[in-house]
Amino acid sequence: MTWFIDRRLNGKNKSMVNRQRFLRRYKAQIKQSISEAINKRSVTDVDSGESVSIPTEDISEPMFHQGRGGLRHRVHPGNDHFVQNDRIERPQGGGGGSGSGQGQASQDGEGQDEFVFQISKDEYLDLLFEDLALPNLKQNQQRQLTEYKTHRAGYTANGVPANISVVRSLQNSLARRTAMTAGKRRELHALEENLAIISNSEPAQLLEEERLRKEIAELRAKIERVPFIDTFDLRYKNYEKRPDPSSQAVMFCLMDVSGSMDQSTKDMAKRFYILLYLFLSRTYKNVEVVYIRHHTQAKEVDEHEFFYSQETGGTIVSSALKLMDEVVKERYNPAQWNIYAAQASDGDNWADDSPLCHEILAKKLLPVVRYYSYIEITRRAHQTLWREYEHLQSTFDNFAMQHIRDQDDIYPVFRELFHKQNATAKD
């Protein structure tokens, strides 16, 4: 029976290299198409693949051709309509020939539609979250947080059969057999040459010829006795565990669900948090997410209740900040955790509560968090909460504010808040 072992890196997908090259070449156009498509999706359909369209003119490539003008004589095979000196009418262009779907109808003209292709979920998320990172992330060197990763570390002479390296073992076998038989093969070659000379010489030298044949047979037997493979030749893939200090982080998601937040505003907040959740879960292994919903009272909830609960009420933002402070003190030591927070609200708050929010953030939360982002989702003018937070932004470098007016602002605001910085802080 014959066995075929496919060791090609892209054996099951032969065009993967070409596909990756295409994605790298037209990354700017693909990312632009993704940023336009993200806002057209449903709230729960953010992590599937995507059909990407690129204008045809963007993927055109340079080509060599003859210059315009001059006199040229050509013979076109299959021509049965024209003879020399006939004038060929130029095709008429029309509004329907652009191919982009944006022009007016026309009875003539032609063009090309935009180039459309499908990208996978992984490719979509890689492009969606490219160049994004949690700001000010620090490596917490704690014994209980140190993980170990297995890495290749060359080859070893001992190991289990599952880790045997066939190629390296055969290379060693060939080297050993070559070294052990090289001298004998040279001697065998010399004896065979002498035997050929004696066999063709006159008069015949039967005794010498018999002696040479006997020595040749002995040398061949010695060469054949060298084993093809020996335990000395076997090599096994070696693996070692290396310490990999982990950066563990916790993200607090605070969402206003008061009566002033209409359904469209809540949907935009949900879209932002779903993007944030996908980004965190895809980028970092050790990230916990704490969901807090608030109206007049704040409550820590699970993921499903955070996104789909219908509970509503008045607005006291400080209740969420107080609850976050309690959770931090109870479960997340700032010396061991990188603490992040993202707050989404329409900016409507009880007037006397906004100064209290300023005080809680300035004295309790901002000194212990790595990064705090506030997203205000409204088409109205900013109110007291925004103005109080503006004072914090001018004082604390780890506090950021952004304004979302409609769905088209969600993804640009998300990238602005979590764009990768030039350097990551280290302890």
From Swiss-Prot:
Biased composition (Gly residues): 92-102
Family: Belongs to the UPF0229 family.
Coiled coil feature spans: none
Pfam families: DUF444 (PF04285)
Region (Disordered): 79-110
Record NCBIfam families: PRK05325.1-2, PRK05325.1-3
InterPro entries: UPF0229
Protein name (record): UPF0229 protein YeaH
Organism: Escherichia coli O139:H28 (strain E24377A / ETEC)
Bias (Basic and acidic residues): 79-90
